[in-house]
Amino acid sequence: MAAPCGSELPANSPLKIPKMEVLSPASPGDLSDGNPSLSDPSTPRGASPLGPGSAAGSGAAASGGLGLGLGGRGAASSSVSFSPGGGSGGAAAAAAAACRGMSWTPAETNALIAVWGNERLVEARYQQLEGAGTVFGSKAPGPAMYERVSRALAELGYERTPSQCRERIKTLRRCYSRVKEHGVGKRKSSYTFEQLEQVFGQGGWDAQPCQPVLINSSGLYQELESDGSTMEDYSQEDWGNHSQELHGYPTDQELDEMPVSKRTLKIKQESSEEAQKRDTMQNIVQILESVQLKWELFQSWTDFSRLHLSNKLAIFGIGYNTRWKEDIRYHYAEISSQVPLGKRLREYFNSEKPEGRIIMTRVQKMNWKNVYYKFLEITISEARCLELHMEIDWIPIAHSKPTGGNVVQYLLPGGIPKSPGLYAIGYEECIERPLSPDVERHALDPGKEGRVDLETLSAQASLQVEVEPTRIIYCYLGIAEVRTLQQCLFLHFQANAKTFSKEWVGINGFLSQNCIVDPGVSPKSIYIKFVEVERDFLSAGSLVECLEKAIGYPLKFNN
């Protein structure tokens, strides 16, 4: 959890004078939170809220209606400054302020919301039922809960007593309920409805838990104008505008000021990431379909308890059908290579998790009829093999200039691990295809012989074939179990005249033959990739078949 930026303010920061707020020394510790105004943060633990001049301050307030200003956060004792109050109701205002307690700043309120959400998740784990996921009980949080919240706030630099935290939570819950039921408020707030929805949603303590939105280190909410207002005093129209402002959505003016190149780059990055995720999921679906697994209907957690999935790695898919179409379609697919399958499936079939909430909502709204799952158990070495294919980039192998006539030497890159693992060798394939119809039509049309333009002539002369984007073809999967990755790759790429042959015999023969080139002709571009795997795991699983299923074609030099 990031510490709020307000905790870094110097002790001599400018003083702010709250409006009509006077604190009485009679109640410095247990202060309620009925005051909705937003002003300076509280004093450090162990120091009097009034500082050295508390007695004078209370006497002056009782006689002349004086206001009190507190010093900057983090000081050992708060400095006190007095300013003339206005009117004859000073004593009444002082008494009312003492009852209400010290007000909460925007940063404090947001930190409290975040801490409260975290503590509710901890409480949920204490109440977890065997084999049933996270379930909240109906018992309201007790004093211990507010003690933990108070300590957590202290770690962030905000000194609040448990009773103050309890009163503030009550106020926030009332604010949330009012906006939830009526959809309207009166004035602005430093927190959004979405934040409160995440920690108070659907009935308060019985709500579904969700990680709260934390304030960022730049003080997103700290810079809001402290106008003494809360969410209760907030109109529906202003609420939407304020929520958009808090979440940082760009306005039309900001979009106009943003350079077009930056906007285009951001869109391209997002679209590239989405395309990569889509391609990865399609690859996983292809693997699941290639092994012809049967869909299983999800009914209860009893099914999973029989399967003993707590310590298994697997490739799994989540599917669904509808009342109109019985065919089962994929909703999601994943390789659970780091987290046990049982834990991942719980997240997708537990309505209190973000993934599970999506599925539950679609079933409740009758978008889906039934939910299904399928999985293929894999070994650790097979999981690393799939990681090698889907997450590790190819490394090109350079070659020297021809020596001794028409022979080139491979130049392996540095940094190849001296440890066991898996490695793959591939080569770049160029696919040629006939000329496009337009070029063929211009070339074969006799009626246009006298008026062929320069573009057509250039196409006929230099583009006899159109080359598609190249792709790298896997041809060999190696297991560095007895030797290290570095030793295995060096053995493959050592150019030896004795191994030269016109017929390719294994991967070494292929690499040796590729070193012999005709004058003016470059050898095939060769690539490698590798991943470290513990030696004890390398002997488990069917690694070659695993990779062949993932890439969709056989490895040429492994058979």
From Swiss-Prot:
InterPro entries: MSANTD2, Myb_DNA-bind_4. The lineage of its organism: Eukaryota, Metazoa, Chordata, Craniata, Vertebrata. It holds the Pfam family Myb_DNA-bind_4. It comes from Mus musculus (Mouse). Residues 46-61 have a biased composition (Low complexity). This is Myb/SANT-like DNA-binding domain-containing protein 2. Signal peptide: none annotated. Residues 103-173 form the Myb-like domain. The modification Phosphoserine is found at residues 13, 24, 27, 32, 48, 436. Keywords: Isopeptide bond, Phosphoprotein, Ubl conjugation. There is a cross-link at residues 268, 343 (Glycyl lysine isopeptide (Lys-Gly) (interchain with G-Cter in SUMO2)). Residues 1-62 are annotated as: Disordered.
